[in-house]
């Protein structure tokens, strides 16, 4: 997902620079890989601030790395646009401070958890569900969001199981879920371990629906799970389908530039959100007519011009008290089908070209 996000960012930077840049200057991209390690993220943050003197930061794939590292940008008054990390608390980490420099254009876990539970309990009618989550900050914070969403529906999970990164055998966790009578497995995890859940079900001869966070859409799940991953469902802010001219242009440019295998973006959500994050920051820099952090933050909180992205068109996506660009009405449910993620519901596919914009009323709740 990190490479897909970076490539989406690169596309946006290239487009903006070809059209003259921002406030008379070309955007310069400084890339670093935090390796999904908190300590590496901290080191990189200090390097980008003190050595590279960056104007703003886009990225963070891993919620744990974001929560450990973004405080340095907050202290330096440099805006951060979280474009993939989804832990609910990310934009709230410094909410009590007079100025909050942390923004996001990915769907928070509180939104995703509610969608997962809505799909499992309300739409599908399951009464018994199990939760399998990894031991990372992302997995455990997501599990908490799932349990809250289930409680709101009057449901208690029949099993709540944890696993570690790089675990290859989920038999023990799956047996507990099966023995408890789970009708569906709800997942929250960041990596290829998700495929081990699907493969474990196949080995046990026990096939129940997998419904989980957006990471079920990633190539490392789809490819490693094979037939066992078919039918898995997850929230998606972006599906690789040319519903609109803007999305078609983005997809065509991505495929032409990066030539992914089978013309499939490994993580379409990451690529799209990476792309949009640059356009949001560029709009703020242009409005501020400055590269000073406080002025960019203020512009982000009061964007005058609409920003056409591939996830949505952003119309005043942020305010001083709301730093989330995505509200619950924007994501749709995706489903793994024949090695790709497609719309889970025909009605969503039919409306794919319709613009789903931020719900200002929902944002204030």
Language-model features, listed with the residues they occupy:
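Extracytosolic ligand-binding ectodomains
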Residues: 1-365
